[in-house]
């Protein structure tokens, strides 16, 4: 697993009336070869946050990763994704044809969606017990697994709705959860992957002043 890649940010700077992306600021502009040593404040490089995180460092979160390979290297935008829920120690509970798995590794390059607000101490204290009790119910035995209708996403969303119900909150269907919480982050991830691979191949990537993209809310828990 390429943990260093998962944490690597991209750099964007302006020159030649273009936006230039790279892993670091070069000494000279790759387009005109002019020295980049002195720039105006508004032309200062900015860091583009990496949308991927080590899922084992995330508490009480919903995680996504490719079923095979990693986002930055192998993912083609069409391959299957696998999802799971972390406990307070970063162990990833996920459902497959083998039943509920409790992974201590393998999710080092994931998209993470926090499920609790930072001040929800009561729920956090009970989280691990809720997750373990939920996972040992008969609904998630290996023979009940079905690729399209009773899968890893069903497992994760059903648990999320159990937590919402315990909190007296309205439950979410798959479409609502996906559109509100998953799609904004996967769109950002897709753009980051495109930039990352182009920079890895050519050393830099150039665009014409793109429109600023909306960011998903930071740190806001679902529950």
Curated annotation (Swiss-Prot):
Disulfide bonds: none annotated. It comes from the Eukaryota. InterPro entries: MKRN2OS-like, MKRN2OS-like_C, MKRN2OS-like_N. It holds the Pfam family DUF4796_C. This is MKRN2 opposite strand protein. It comes from Homo sapiens. The lineage of its organism: Eukaryota, Metazoa, Chordata, Craniata, Vertebrata. The gene is MKRN2OS.
């Amino acid at each position: 697993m390429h943990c260093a890649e998962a944490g690597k940010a991209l750099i964007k700077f302006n020159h030649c009336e273009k936006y230039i992306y790279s892993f670091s600021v070069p000494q000279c502009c790759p387009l005109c070869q002019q020295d980049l040593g002195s720039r105006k404040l508004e032309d200062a490089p900015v860091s583009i946050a990496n949308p991927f995180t080590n899922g084992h460092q995330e508490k009480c979160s919903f995680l996504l990763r490719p079923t095979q390979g990693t986002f930055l290297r192998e993912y083609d935008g069409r391959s299957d994704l696998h999802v799971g829920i972390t406990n307070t120690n970063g162990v990833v509970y996920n459902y497959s044809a083998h039943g509920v798995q409790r992974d201590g590794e393998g999710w080092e390059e994931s998209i993470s969606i926090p499920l609790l607000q930072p001040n929800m101490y009561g729920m956090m204290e009970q989280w691990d017990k809720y997750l373990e009790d939920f996972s040992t119910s008969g609904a998630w035995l290996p023979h009940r697994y079905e690729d399209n209708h009773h899968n890893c996403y069903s497992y994760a969303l059903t648990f999320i709705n159990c937590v919402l119900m315990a909190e007296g909150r309205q439950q979410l269907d798959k479409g609502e959860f996906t559109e509100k919480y998953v799609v904004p982050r996967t769109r950002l991830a897709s753009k980051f992957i495109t930039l990352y691979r182009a920079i890895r191949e050519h050393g830099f990537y150039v665009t014409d002043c793109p429109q600023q993209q909306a960011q998903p809310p930071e740190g806001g828990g679902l529950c």
